[in-house]
Regions:
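Hydrophobic h-region of N-terminal signal peptides that target proteins for export
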Residues: 9-18
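Activation on beta-sandwich/Ig-like modules and their edge loops
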Residues: 19-151
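Short amphipathic alpha-helical "recognition" segments used for binding
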Residues: 6-7, 59
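Positively charged n-region of N-terminal signal peptides that target proteins for export
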Residues: 1-4
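N-terminal targeting leaders only when they are immediately followed by extended low-complexity/repeat-rich tracts
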Residues: 7-10, 143
Length: 151
């Protein structure tokens, strides 16, 4: 009888642990622009990483609050934390673009959005995407990797 109870408790505990590890994939990385059409050797002092971006898509029918979430790149210091109250609307995209300090660069200056609903664009200076490849991850506010892409 003791063996039976221990078996049932072990089974129950393992199911609970598996349920906690599994993360629902509702925010996905839908696009990565790691090599923008900007000429990377335009002129001395012109930042070459402007135009790089990561696009996220909300698969849910409800808005998702990204407060406390992070976007991570390949380097140890490449961590962008979403500002408080950052919302990604249902079935919508959110773009996180690189913007070199004091460059005044706007993604709208580089890409045309004619005929498309305007997407929310956040600018950051933490993640510079490698042209030779890396892994980019979306991490929720409790540390679970919600999605990642390796290119």
């Amino acid at each position: 009888m003791k063996k039976y109870i221990v078996f049932i408790l072990s089974l129950f505990l393992s199911l609970q642990l598996n349920a906690q590890v599994s993360v629902k994939k509702y925010i996905v990385i839908s696009e990565v622009m790691y090599d923008s059409p900007l000429n990377e050797q335009i002129a001395q002092g012109i930042p070459y990483s402007n135009g790089e971006y990561i696009e996220l898509y909300n698969l849910e029918n409800t808005a998702v609050d990204l407060t406390g979430w992070k976007l991570t790149g390949g380097g140890k210091t490449e961590i962008y934390q979403f500002p408080a109250n950052t919302i990604i609307n249902p079935r919508s995209t959110l773009i996180v673009a690189y913007q070199y300090k004091d460059s005044g660069f706007l993604l709208n200056d580089l890409y045309s959005y004619d005929g498309y609903e305007m997407t929310t664009i956040l600018y950051q200076r933490k993640i510079i995407l490698s042209n030779s490849g890396e892994t980019v991850s979306v991490v929720d506010n409790v540390g679970n990797v919600v999605d990642y892409i390796t290119y």
